[in-house]
């Protein structure tokens, strides 16, 4: 009796203590929230930052507040197959000759009879804040994204720009309505203070210095593979020593169709108009960031931030300048082409403006709000490539921190701080971010103001394998079903799925590999295959993270300071290690638990409280461009960002209530060590057997390579 009574007393005390803790935490959070509200009431306005995010399959504008919440937003999903339709979205005029059609009901959005899906395979429904792109006769009914040949991916430069303006106009119109309600209730209105940009990298656009318009009506997108012959010919005629020398300069394996260098060479070799403009010194080269900033600034700023410039294959990582040897390697005469100035990720680029040809297409309402913005000289002052922006938005600032974005593919970045590490294990070296105005403030190190580097690894197929299960095998009805179905079985039943539909990327780098499903038996079910598909993505993320850690403790072991910086966060060295995740597949608790189980107990998987990490990263970059910390509209420094975005205004050592950020979730491994190692061994064997598949197809190798991907 007495032991039971004793346990009851202990339990009651613990319950009361924990309840008191929760109450205290809740009161502190409410106090912090009310303090900020009172501060806002004493202000003439509440500051916001506009973030433009141009992705491979969609564009969006989000107006962020201090908590990293979207006060107003608008998104346009690109169409690739529609043939005609109205352009009423966000205020663009529809040409009188364009046939109009009624907008379908939400849930039944279709283009040419086919459902529309996001890059991660999720069904898209048109809402007030999200529109499906329809086509404009002014652009000959061409969509933003085109696939003219197998392996070819093109974007329409002017339509990219129009989509951005549409999204911004719609966000501002929504903000007008919100502000009217706030003023009526005695609250100060919101006000946009500055703008940042995040964009898909490597995509190459060429335009005329004289007219400011594209030389040809398409840009070559990052995942286009038309340059494979150029790349292979280059490397067959380049010594191994020279290849290593170029790798040291760029951090990139230039034996790849990814980077801008081979795309520029293709334009000059295959497009007479581009060749003519080049010979006449009228050719301007840029990636998407350069194109947008040039067109959207009154000053026609011709710049590229370091995170984008580092993906061209022309920039020297040591100098952060264009390198003559790299330009000469690709046969580019620097005197005949205009290259953008390489700048930091966080500085004033120019004042917001809109080209006249776009302004003429607008209806009165969007035209008015945009003109008001133009009159205010709103500064554009933050820019990051999408993966770097995601890293910043995940607050992965410390050396050794890692983030993984699960989209169509999977991109993992590992922060190496101010140290440039050239990978010996299949990863790329790239710029993470450069915020030059971050000075020592609030105990932060002054090194934060220096350029930061990262190791990067990419998985070719992530969300795309879920689409394949849905559309090709019809194992699932919706992409959201893959997690629950995979979790109906405790493991894959011996099945290993290597999703190498377009070869293997980091750390294997084998374009000749192809997808394989191994280990099936009569015991195998649809659930086993679904789980094996998810595990195939997660195993590749583990392989990349292990490769990056090997680099950090290999080359980095020569530098004691570097080891001390990463010792508390690096993979397989400390239980404090965290992999920050975002993107479509990260929404699934089941998928993220599988990822945590595969990584093991040394790595926690942390899902961000904000769904828009990439756009948030661009907003942070714009905020930090103000040199005076007291002029920064939302956050004084990076610690302040974490305080408000992750801890709801509380200090990080105070406990945060899960209710404050329901999407902030930590996944920890629940797997058995022996089982985890056994499944990893199965994976390694399966990968080896999937490699070189195309090489073994006699007489077909060269033709298949031409259509690779």
From Swiss-Prot:
Disordered, as annotated region: 86-110
Q: Which organism is it from?
A: Saccharomyces cerevisiae (strain ATCC 204508 / S288c) (Baker's yeast)
Q: Which reaction does it catalyse?
A: glycerol + ATP = sn-glycerol 3-phosphate + ADP + H(+)
What are the protein's GO molecular function terms?
ATP binding; glycerol kinase activity
Q: In which pathway does it act?
A: Polyol metabolism; glycerol degradation via glycerol kinase pathway; sn-glycerol 3-phosphate from glycerol: step 1/1
Q: Protein name, please?
A: Glycerol kinase
Which positions in this protein are listed as binding substrate? 56, 201, 258, 386
**By its UniProt entry, which PROSITE patterns does this protein fall under?**
FGGY_KINASES_1 (PS00933), FGGY_KINASES_2 (PS00445)
Function, as annotated: Key enzyme in the regulation of glycerol uptake and metabolism. Catalyzes the phosphorylation of glycerol to yield sn-glycerol 3-phosphate.
User: EC?
Assistant: 2.7.1.30
Q: What class of enzyme is it?
A: transferase
Which Pfam families is this protein grouped with? FGGY_C, FGGY_N
Q: Which GO terms describe its cellular component?
A: cytoplasm; mitochondrion
Member of which family? Answer: Belongs to the FGGY kinase family.
InterPro entries per the record? ATPase_NBD, Carb_kinase_FGGY_CS, FGGY_C, FGGY_N, GK1-3_metazoan-type, Glycerol_kin
Task: List GO BP terms, alphabetically.
Answer: glycerol catabolic process; glycerol metabolic process; glycerol-3-phosphate biosynthetic process; triglyceride metabolic process
Q: Which UniProt keywords apply?
A: ATP-binding, Glycerol metabolism, Kinase, Nucleotide-binding, Transferase
Q: Does the keyword Nucleotide-binding apply?
A: yes
**Which sites bind ATP?**
60, 408, 463, 584-588
Instruction: Please give the SUPFAM superfamilies that the UniProt record associates with this protein.
Output: Actin-like ATPase domain (SSF53067)
